Every structure is written in C-alpha cells, then in structure tokens.
Amino acid sequence: METKLTLGNKGSLSLLALSGVVASLFYWSHVVAGRILWPSYNPLAQPVSDLTANSAVSQGLASRILYGYDFFNLLFCFVLLVFFRRVTRINRTFYAGLVLKAVAEVLSTIGYKLFPLADTEWTSSFQNNMHYAITGVIVLCYIVLSLLLAIGLAKTKKHPAMSRFLALFSLVFITSGLLTVLVANFQPQYAGLVERINLYSLMVSNIVLSLWMFTGAKDIGLKDA
C-alpha cells in the first residue's frame, strides 16, 4: 500500500537512505585507524571492541570516529522506518524486523557508550560484564530481526534477489555469531576473525538495504500483507 508523498520527499528519503553506506564506511574507518595506532593489535584473535576499550592506545581516535558511525547508523534506522511505513509497505513481519533493528541499534549506541570495555584483558569487572550483557541482547535481537526480514520479504514473492540476500545474511550472521562464542572458548586465537565475519556481514547488509532503497524507491511498491 502506497502512502502519498511528494516526489521531493521520496527523493529526499532515497538520498538519506545512503546514510547506511556512510555509516558502514565510518565503522570500517574506526577499525583501520585503530589498527594504525595500535601496531601490535591482532585482528585474528582480538575483537573489534578492543580498539575502543578504555585501556587501548587506539581508544581516543577510534571512539571519535565511531561517533560518525553512530549518527549515520541511527539516521539510517530512522529512514528505514519512515520509508517502509510511508513510501512502501512490505508486511508486518518485515516491518517488525526493522523496528527491532532500530531498538537494537539504539541499545548499541547508548549501551556501549555507557559501558565500553574497561580493558583488553576482558577481566570480570562490572563494566565489562555489562558490556557483555549488552552484546548478548543485541546479538539476540539481530538473530530474530534477520529472520523477520528474510521471512517477511520472502512472503511477498516479489523480490527474489533481495529475498535470497536476506536469507543468506541470516544464515551467515547466525552461524558466525554462534561460532564466535565457540571459537572464543576453544580456539581463541581465531576469535577476532570469526567475530569480523559476523560484524562485517551486518555492515554489508546495511549497505545493500541502503542501495536497495536508493535505487528502488520508484518500483518496489507492494500490497500490504
């Protein structure tokens, strides 16, 4: 079901949809900058969050760059909600996934600012335990929302390519998320690598969703289901 908007408003939303691409670029930039400042950082073993831990040499610059990611990422979540409510409605299942994504990202932005890792040794302190708890909730949200997005879009049978991508994203994200826990406990020397597959799959999904809105704003209208 289409909600009437002016062409200018639709164009503005399509342009703002690119905030998902910008957010992902900021995210990767904070990783690159952090590694430059921390030459001994081991990306195969260490998680990305080590780069912004309070005790990390890279904390200052990496955290400042991450503010750019936070801003554009939250903007992207807002655009997703508006676009698929006022411009194009898919169905309730798909939209529920978008709402859960927004909730997860707000929790991530606020939670990680309040409780960054205290150190890179992952000691059992209150601050670190809160960081782990927030991570657990966010990962659970993303497991559920990835399934909601994939199932919701697949139900329409209108966008097979995008449906396949979301199904693949769900598989990669859920599998790599579970493997991260297992590898961290049994093969910690590869924990950082597996975690990156998980996090970078999320960044790729944001870029694809962003470009999908940007290029498909005029031809992805569907009946509300």
Region locations from a protein language model:
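Terminal transmembrane helical module of multi-pass membrane proteins
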Residues: 149-225
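Short, Lys/Arg-rich, polar N-terminal cytosolic tail immediately upstream
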Residues: 1-13
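Interfacial segments of alpha-helical transmembrane regions
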Residues: 13-21, 87-103, 160-169
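Membrane-proximal helix-loop-helix units in multi-pass membrane proteins
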Residues: 107-151
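Hydrophobic alpha-helical transmembrane segments of integral membrane proteins
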Residues: 92-124, 178-191
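Interfacial helix-start motif at the membrane-water boundary
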Residues: 51-71
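Internal transmembrane alpha-helix with an interfacial aromatic "cap," most often the third helix
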Residues: 67-98, 144-156, 216
